[in-house]
């Protein structure tokens, strides 16, 4: 358990807070490219407690600036895109992607007011369907060469969803390899040929055993937490027989992302990004090591589950997450349908807006959560001292952080380490875009 002060330290992310200062040192997802794809590419964004507006100008450049016009505080999200920037609808003040004031049209011709005005702005980069922003001071760090960033656009798909609670409790679910045996338990296995775009519905690599069966029948895994330059690797072992072991390799990508295998050919890189301290978005890039991603199918599957424009889940606390007692008895462990995002959403939101960690009791199976909190506290302390925390990278360091491995397969019990490494290598050798690396 944590003290109130310890919990506040790692959950509060507004401007001026220790964790907020840390998270601002990294690139954070701010919006999907899809959200700015229409005729009016302007969207209000709340990120780390800051109210902002993201837009694409006529030249295709992205900008992220303060939402309130510095003139008299009106909402720039209702502005006009023209003349190289975003124009306030109140008095026509015009700002470019860097927050520079280009025009104050009601002022006298000889006025220098415009030259003295600078709207808050943050740099934006696009990576495979997600617009990332850097809200911290100084030069942004280099982005690591993760698979999700270097894969061609044809082999990736990006999506997001809102969760009505603090970011940390959702991130901790993502590095908890035991909950899948319970929270995501399906009493019947799906035909793998119908599993495209779904987590835990494919067969495990090098076997004909569905992932859902493995999670259901083997509920006491052995968990290895291995420190890495990017955070840590999680290796979860479920002994299937005297001769074979199920090996699942996942990763914590500091500060607020994880990478997991979705199927034999696809991985998910998922960030949990604070809107404020009591709600957040998950952002995900799905990366295929096989055929190009069927983006239309992936999008169709997910848009059926979310309400736009804010990506609010159709199943939520207001309708009891679709809970069905009959389904809970006969089909799923939760009775909340087949979408595992709903299961995770219920688990996280039911802890409260900000989980009270002063009353929790962690067990042996929570070792990754304990490891992450230690890493987070150390990084907060370093950042507070003006030192460079883990994963604030220069270009050379970023180029050295590749992959990482993310595998779900069944191999020989006596050499599970050799098995997953060979399996990962085989996956990469077969991919069209990895150059075998």
Task: Kindly give the residue locations of the regions a language model identified.
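Short, charge-rich amphipathic segments
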Residues: 2-4, 18-21, 100-109, 299-314
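C-terminal catalytic domain of Rieske-type non-heme iron oxygenases
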Residues: 15, 61, 138-437
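Rieske [2Fe-2S] iron-sulfur-binding domain
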Residues: 1, 15, 31-157, 222, ...
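A boundary/linker detector
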Residues: 1-27, 31
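Tryptophan-centered short beta-strand motifs
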Residues: 21-22, 27, 62, 101, ...
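A short, structural micro-pattern
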Residues: 24, 118, 125-127, 266, ...
């Amino acid at each position: 358990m944590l003290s109130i002060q310890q919990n506040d330290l790692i959950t509060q992310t507004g401007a001026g807070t220790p964790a907020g200062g840390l998270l601002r040192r990294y690139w954070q997802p701010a919006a999907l490219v899809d959200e700015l794809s229409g005729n009016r590419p302007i969207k209000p964004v709340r990120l780390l407690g800051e109210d902002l507006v993201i837009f694409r100008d006529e030249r295709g450049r992205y900008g992220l600036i303060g939402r309130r016009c510095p003139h008299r505080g009106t909402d720039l999200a209702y502005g006009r895109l023209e003349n190289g920037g975003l124009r306030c609808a109140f008095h026509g003040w015009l700002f470019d992607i860097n927050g520079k004031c280009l025009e104050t049209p009601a002022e006298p011709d000889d006025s220098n007011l415009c030259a003295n005005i600078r709207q808050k702005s943050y740099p934006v980069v696009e990576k495979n369907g997600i617009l990332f922003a850097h809200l911290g001071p100084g030069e942004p760090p280099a982005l690591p060469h993760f698979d999700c960033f270097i894969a061609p656009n044809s082999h990736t798909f990006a999506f997001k969803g809102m969760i009505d609670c603090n970011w940390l409790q959702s991130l901790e679910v993502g590095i908890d390899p035991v909950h899948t045996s319970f929270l995501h338990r399906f009493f019947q296995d799906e035909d793998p040929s119908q599993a495209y775009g779904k987590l835990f519905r494919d067969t495990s690599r090098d076997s004909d055993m569905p992932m859902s069966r493995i999670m259901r029948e083997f509920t006491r895994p052995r968990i290895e937490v291995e420190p890495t330059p990017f955070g840590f690797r999680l290796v979860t072992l479920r002994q299937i027989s005297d001769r074979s072991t199920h090996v699942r390799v996942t990763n914590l990508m500091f500060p607020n992302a994880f990478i997991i295998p979705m199927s034999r050919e696809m991985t998910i890189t998922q960030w949990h990004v604070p809107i404020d301290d009591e709600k957040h978005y998950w952002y995900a890039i799905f990366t295929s090591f096989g055929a190009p991603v069927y983006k239309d199918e992936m999008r169709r599957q997910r848009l059926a589950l979310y309400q736009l424009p804010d990506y609010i889940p159709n199943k939520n606390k207001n309708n009891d997450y679709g809970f069905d007692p009959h389904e809970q008895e006969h089909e799923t462990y939760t009775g909340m349908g087949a979408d595992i995002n709903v299961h995770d959403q219920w688990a996280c939101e039911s802890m409260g807006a900000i989980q009270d960690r002063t009353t929790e009791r962690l067990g042996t199976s929570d070792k990754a959560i304990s490891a992450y909190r230690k890493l987070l506290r150390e990084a907060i302390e370093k950042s507070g001292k003006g030192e460079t925390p883990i994963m604030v990278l220069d270009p050379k360091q970023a180029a050295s952080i590749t992959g990482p491995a993310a595998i779900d397969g069944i191999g020989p019990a006596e050499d599970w380490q050799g098995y997953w490494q060979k399996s990962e290598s085989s996956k990469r050798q077969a991919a069209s875009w990895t150059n075998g690396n």
